[in-house]
Amino acid sequence: MSKIILTGDRPTGRLHIGHYVGSLRRRVQLQNTGDFDEIYIMIADAQALTDNFDNPEKVRSNIGEVALDYMAAGLDPEKSTIFIQSMIPELTELTFYYMNLVTVSRLQRNPTVKAEITMRNFEASIPAGFLCYPISQTADITAFKATTVPVGEDQLPMLEQAKEIVHKFNSIYEPVLVEPEILLPENEACMRLPGTDGKAKMSKSLGNCIYLADSPADIKTKIMSMFTDPLHIQVSDPGHIEGNTVFTYLDAFCTDEHFERYLPDYKNLDELKEHYKRGGLGDMKIKKFLNNVMQEELEPIRLRREELAKNMDYVYDVLKKGTEKARQCAAQTMSCLLYTSDAADDL
């Protein structure tokens, strides 16, 4: 069986470092291992419309922005197929068929859907398209025969529901659909990076993001104003690591080599944490260190992005070719499922 990855993002804005450590960095690593036969990266504009239908320009204008972020971060069109979801009608068709395999009550019980409904204040009036998001996601996964789906921990209920749909289809008809394996982020800090203000989620709407496209000055300003330990008032005060956003970011980004270059008084992050917990280490010092780490990590991405942005014709050509390739695969899957289910047997 071919090893295939499917992953992607909703184009509701430029990508930030939460996207980067949560999935994008891992995608680049997986792409470069050569261990997978196909890697499909989806710009999920159709799914983005489920809660942005009154503002389609927001979605449309960010397709190119997300594509820029993808390629700037290291996704290679020669190794990964980057495509636009709405330009593959077979995905909508698959979603329609799978809707018959799921009850409304099951969709309403999905923990991820419930959390997203609350966050978006949809309790009084839930868009049907939003409620059916897990079904659409299942169509995406199965259309490209994905064997591996990298997700954050908050998306696990969505993948479990996708497996349920796959299992039900295979039980009713023939076992032609593949149940995908789940691939979680590398470490706990990467599961869901908090915002710079210490909020549980980095969010464009909350204004607490560091974007991949941010300038060095913007990155520094955001880091220097970052939430730390409110009880760590004096340098001599013992500090807390748990819930300290600066240390969460260091967990996600820094290596021992960073200490050699920027903070040679310490061998590694564990030593820095121990000193902070004892007291005698100021927030300004660790913020300056984090700024050096982040500038080193993000500078090559920003520079590649600036170069790519000078030739958007190339970027859109990549999307066009990727979408054409992805549609061929989705059409093959749709044909197979119609044949298996005898849906068009008399035609």
Residue ranges of model-derived segments:
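N-terminal Rossmann-like or analogous alpha/beta NTP/dinucleotide-binding catalytic cores
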Residues: 2-139, 296-298, 302, 306
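Mature, solvent-exposed C-terminal subdomains and processed small-chain segments of exported/organellar
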Residues: 278, 283, 292, 296-315, ...
